[in-house]
């Protein structure tokens, strides 16, 4: 399995809502990252399986540029890939696991779908909360989580780790049936 977390590189974006994919990978393994030309990577063991963690270093809207290099580097197929990214239409505390689908308006996922030529890419969408009325979408997704939101997000990351283990052991359908209806609260 190759878990690709989406985000933007650099300290300016490190803790923003849009970087929830990178933040989840750091939750799983926060040191000893190695860097290739188009991505940073690491490995962990989950449910007795070696799992590669990948952060494209191309900026969010160009995430697809890294994907052919990721597939080649890890000798992976499309079926091995799970993409993790933020979803402004999902409430903070919720995740959605899917086997395939459209980009849903997310430019990072749009870039990946275009680069790989298919919508049949497994993904975990992470709710980042409701944008306050009147606030610009870009300002919201590039804003940082509050202390209270971090408490929820860390619990969400625990649930996501469990979901990855279920995907590895019992399959994505089982994970969808367990986790798509859950909501993490303080």
Curated annotation (Swiss-Prot):
A molecular function GO annotation: tRNA binding
Gene Ontology CC terms: cytoplasm
Subcellular location: Cytoplasm
Gene3D superfamilies, sorted: Peptidyl-tRNA hydrolase
EC number per UniProt: 3.1.1.29
GO biological process terms held by the UniProt record: protein quality control for misfolded or incompletely synthesized proteins; rescue of stalled ribosome
Keyword Lyase part of the UniProt annotation: no
Active site, per annotation: 18
Record field: catalytic activity: an N-acyl-L-alpha-aminoacyl-tRNA + H2O = an N-acyl-L-amino acid + a tRNA + H(+)
SUPFAM superfamilies: Peptidyl-tRNA hydrolase-like (SSF53178)
PROSITE patterns listed in its UniProt record: PEPT_TRNA_HYDROL_1, PEPT_TRNA_HYDROL_2
Membrane-spanning intervals of the chain: none
List of residues binding tRNA: 13, 59, 61, 107
Keyword tRNA-binding: yes
Site description Stabilizes the basic form of H active site to accept a proton, residues in chain: 86
Entry similarity comment: Belongs to the PTH family.
Function: Hydrolyzes ribosome-free peptidyl-tRNAs (with 1 or more amino acids incorporated), which drop off the ribosome during protein synthesis, or as a result of ribosome stalling.
Assembly: Monomer.
PANTHER family: PEPTIDYL-TRNA HYDROLASE (PTHR17224:SF1)
Protein name from the UniProt record: Peptidyl-tRNA hydrolase
Organism ancestry: Bacteria, Thermotogati, Thermotogota, Thermotogae, Thermotogales
């Amino acid at each position: 399995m190759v878990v690709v977390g989406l985000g933007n590189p650099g300290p300016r974006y490190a803790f923003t809502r849009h970087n929830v994919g990178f933040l989840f990978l750091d939750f799983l393994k926060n040191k000893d990252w190695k860097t290739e030309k188009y991505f940073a990577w690491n490995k962990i063991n989950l449910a007795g399986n070696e799992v590669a963690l990948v952060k494209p270093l191309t900026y969010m809207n160009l995430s697809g540029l890294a994907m052919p290099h990721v597939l080649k580097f890890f000798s992976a197929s499309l079926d091995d890939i799970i993409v993790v990214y933020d979803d402004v239409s999902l409430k903070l505390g919720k995740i959605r696991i899917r086997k395939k689908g459209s980009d849903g308006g997310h430019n990072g996922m749009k870039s990946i779908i275009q680069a790989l030529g298919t919508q049949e890419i497994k993904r975990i969408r992470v709710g980042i909360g409701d944008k306050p009325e009147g606030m610009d979408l870009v300002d919201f997704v590039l804003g940082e989580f509050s202390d209270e939101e971090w408490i929820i997000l860390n619990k969400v990351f625990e649930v996501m780790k469990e979901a990855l283990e279920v995907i590895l052991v019992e399959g994505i359908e089982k994970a969808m049936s367990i986790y798509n209806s859950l909501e993490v609260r303080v």
